[in-house]
Curated annotation (Swiss-Prot):
This is Cysteine synthase. Belongs to the cysteine synthase/cystathionine beta-synthase family. It is an enzyme of class 2 (transferase). Pathway: Amino-acid biosynthesis; L-cysteine biosynthesis; L-cysteine from L-serine: step 2/2. The modification N6-(pyridoxal phosphate)lysine is found at K46. It comes from Staphylococcus epidermidis (strain ATCC 35984 / DSM 28319 / BCRC 17069 / CCUG 31568 / BM 3577 / RP62A).
Length: 310
């Protein structure tokens, strides 16, 4: 059924499609379904939390049109906030590690946002520190995606129920999501555990920065995952297991899915699909594995992920 016209672009956030992977999954493995979050108007899963955090602040009287928002971001949350701010009449300033892709930087600027780069060696901690400095100096409002309860709550209210409705009572045996802020995993995981008591919730993190597994933080190339610390927005009780994914493994899988499935996915999506394939092999035929593809590969055309010699 075609969607009826809406009054605001923010009204078309959510209700993203789910697609079965057919060519990268072994015949004797579980079925794998991916939720295409890059179909949101701002191009990623982070559109959901961007709108949720802004609307929460509006309800609480913390912001009004014309005010300035500041936020540390590895890219997609900033892009989501930038487009929401543009639509609602707010100014936006973002701090982000200098290691993030050129497309992400350009997208932020295209929406009229100001961008402040921080040292890549400091990862997200450096961006968070700089955002707090700007907030204190100028009195900006900071949504704080790593602390804001609206982050996991919006996934509990929308993403999780969408999956339950999309699978129409069918069993979901495992749900996997990469952990950046942990909002998606926490919110969706809570919903699915109520609906499917035997579902396995799996956290995905960078092999090079295995903080959730008890390891040390470190630099990695899985943009949007592995902040280098355990965020307040992550419910560490919701997941049952952790799968670590390497830089090259995630990139190779993202490229393969583009070639073999026609799905142009980002780096963290490559990590999600690789982890889903491992879980599908473990569970075996007849089971159902679901994961989220956070962003589109077009955001990585200037990076080694999709750089071609000719």
């Amino acid at each position: 059924m075609a969607q009826k016209p809406v009054d605001y672009v923010t009204q078309i956030i959510g209700n993203t499609p789910v697609v079965k992977l057919r060519n990268v999954v072994d015949d004797d493995a579980a079925d794998i379904y991916v939720k295409l979050e890059y179909q949101n108007p701002g191009g990623s899963v982070k559109d959901r939390i961007a709108l949720a955090m802004i609307e929460k602040a509006e309800r609480e009287g913390k912001i009004k049109p014309g005010d300035t928002i500041v936020e540390p971001t590895s890219g997609n949350t900033g892009i989501g906030l930038a487009f929401v701010c543009a639509a609602k009449g707010y100014k936006a300033v973002f701090t982000m590690p200098e290691t993030m892709s050129q497309e992400r930087r350009n997208l932020l600027k295209a929406y009229g946002a100001e961008l402040v780069l921080t040292p890549g060696s400091e990862a997200m901690k450096g961006a968070i520190k700089k955002a707090k400095e700007l907030k204190e100096e100028h009195g900006y409002f900071e949504p704080q995606q790593f602390e804001n309860p609206a982050n996991p709550e919006i996934h509990e209210l929308t993403t999780g129920p969408e999956l339950v409705e999309q699978f129409e009572g069918r069993q979901i045996d495992a749900f996997l999501a990469g952990v950046g802020t942990g909002g998606t995993l926490s919110g969706v995981g809570k919903v699915l555990k109520k609906e499917y008591p035997n579902v396995e919730i799996v956290a995905i993190e960078p092999e090079a920065s295995p903080v959730l597994s008890g390891g040390e933080p470190g630099p990695h190339k899985l943009q949007g995952l592995g902040a280098g610390f355990v965020p307040d927005t992550l419910n560490t009780e919701v997941y049952d297991s952790i799968i670590k994914v390497g830089n090259d493994t995630a990139m190779d899988m993202a490229r393969r899915v583009a070639r073999e499935e026609g799905i142009l996915a980002g780096i963290s999506s490559g990590a999600a699909i690789y982890a889903a394939i491992q879980k599908a092999k473990e569970l075996g035929k007849g089971k159902t594995v679901v994961t989220v593809l956070p962003s589109n590969g077009e955001r990585y055309l200037s990076t080694p992920l999709y750089s071609f010699d000719n």
